[in-house]
UniProtKB/Swiss-Prot annotation:
<keyword id="KW-0800">Toxin</keyword>
<keyword id="KW-0960">Knottin</keyword>
<feature type="disulfide bond">
    <location>
        <begin position="70"/>
        <end position="86"/>
    </location>
</feature>
<comment type="function">
    <text>Ion channel inhibitor.</text>
</comment>
<comment type="similarity">
    <text>Belongs to the neurotoxin 10 (Hwtx-1) family. 26 (ICK-1) subfamily.</text>
</comment>
<feature type="disulfide bond">
    <location>
        <begin position="57"/>
        <end position="71"/>
    </location>
</feature>
<feature type="signal peptide">
    <location>
        <begin position="1"/>
        <end position="21"/>
    </location>
</feature>
<dbReference type="Pfam" id="PF07740">
    <property type="entry name" value="Toxin_12"/>
</dbReference>
<feature type="disulfide bond">
    <location>
        <begin position="64"/>
        <end position="76"/>
    </location>
</feature>
<feature type="propeptide">
    <location>
        <begin position="22"/>
        <end position="50"/>
    </location>
</feature>
<protein>
    <recommendedName>
        <fullName>U8-barytoxin-Tl1a</fullName>
    </recommendedName>
</protein>
<dbReference type="GO" id="GO:0090729">
    <property type="term" value="F:toxin activity"/>
</dbReference>
<keyword id="KW-0732">Signal</keyword>
<keyword id="KW-0872">Ion channel impairing toxin</keyword>
<keyword id="KW-0964">Secreted</keyword>
<dbReference type="InterPro" id="IPR011696">
    <property type="entry name" value="Huwentoxin-1"/>
</dbReference>
<dbReference type="GO" id="GO:0008200">
    <property type="term" value="F:ion channel inhibitor activity"/>
</dbReference>
Length: 95
């Protein structure tokens, strides 16, 4: 009787270990898939900030042709067709 109980307990323990190992393997596969998904969409999350560490960006009230030329927190504004300048875009901190 004692050996039968011991064999049953050992059998249950081995089944537990096998199912646990299978679950861990499935989790690692899911983590790999999630990592690949994040890498695929990572480019969408990273945005290039305008004017950060960019040589020659136009300062406040400097002449410009488009917003990409202005430094951070500035945009290219025009009041006449020939008068374009960098103006504050009313933002603070990091974008």
């Amino acid at each position: 009787m004692k050996t039968l109980v011991l064999v049953a307990v050992l059998g249950l323990a081995s089944l537990y270990l096998l199912s646990y190992a299978s679950e861990v393997q499935q989790l690692s596969v899911a983590e790999e898939e999630f990592g690949a998904l994040i890498d695929a969409f990572g480019g969408l999350l990273e945005t290039e900030e305008r004017g950060v560490n960019k040589e020659g960006c136009r300062k406040f009230l400097g002449g410009c042709e488009n917003t990409g030329q202005c430094c951070l927190h500035l945009f290219c504004k025009y009041d006449t067709p020939f008068n374009h300048f960098c103006a504050w875009d009313l933002s603070f901190g990091r974008k």
